[in-house]
Amino acid sequence: MKWHYLLADLMKIPILVDAEPERTKTELGHLLDLSSYIVCSGKFPEKWTSISCIPSALLEILVQYPRARFVIATLGENGCMMLERIEDDSGIDAVDIGNVAESLRLKVHKDDNLPTCVSSKFMRLSGRGHGTIHGRLLIGTAEKIPAPELVDTTGCGDAFIGAVLYGLCTEMAPEKMLPFACQVAGIKCRAIGARTGLPWRSDARLSKYLREAP
């Protein structure tokens, strides 16, 4: 493991891990042990946990890595899914996270062209693994980009993660952070290359996320 991860952990600096499946399981496992936040592609949760249901796989990841405050799976044109943990010792009965996800999908406004977010309440959640967590599930939708404007998706994942980091540093609420990150990724798609289309902070398309309080 590289020294700067250990130094950040020693200095209690939060660590966001981009869980790339190309890393070896041992190397990535050590990083996830230190993670404060985890972001991954939609294929990673099943590959890591052997659980095909994404919400249940995200729950299993948070059970495996108790220091992580949330895990986000990016889902391309389907947006993203986030499982956020809070510390709570209440003994309430657990609710199946798959059922929670289905309920949230019904609340998504499919006619919205711009990114949106729907969230469950905080509750004790169970999945197809053995553990439970107290937290909430959020679904963020992607921007609906007209076909003539869709140029190149290279670097969209990195753009999304960069926006999540900005959201964390500015203490954005998750309900705003997810649409913001999806919007940044959507803007990037309109130019060739990983960096050319990245928006400036002054971009008018981001103003609704940046002018409001968290």
What is each PLM-predicted segment?
Residues 45-46, 80:
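A generic structural signal for short hydrophobic patches within well-formed alpha-helices
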Residues 23-31:
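Short, glycine/polar-rich helix-capping loops at beta-to-alpha or helix-loop-helix junctions
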Residues 24-25, 52-214:
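Conserved phosphate-binding/catalytic region of the ribokinase-like
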Residues 8-18:
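Short beta-strand/loop segments at the ligand-binding rim of alpha/beta enzyme cores
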Residues 1-2, 19-24:
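Short beta->alpha connector loops
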Residues 35-45, 71:
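A short beta-strand/loop micro-motif in the catalytic core of glycosyltransferases
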Residues 30-31, 38, 64:
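Structural alpha-helical scaffold elements that stabilize or flank donor/cofactor-binding regions
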Residues 12-13, 35-36, 68:
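Short, well-ordered alpha-helix to beta-strand connector turns
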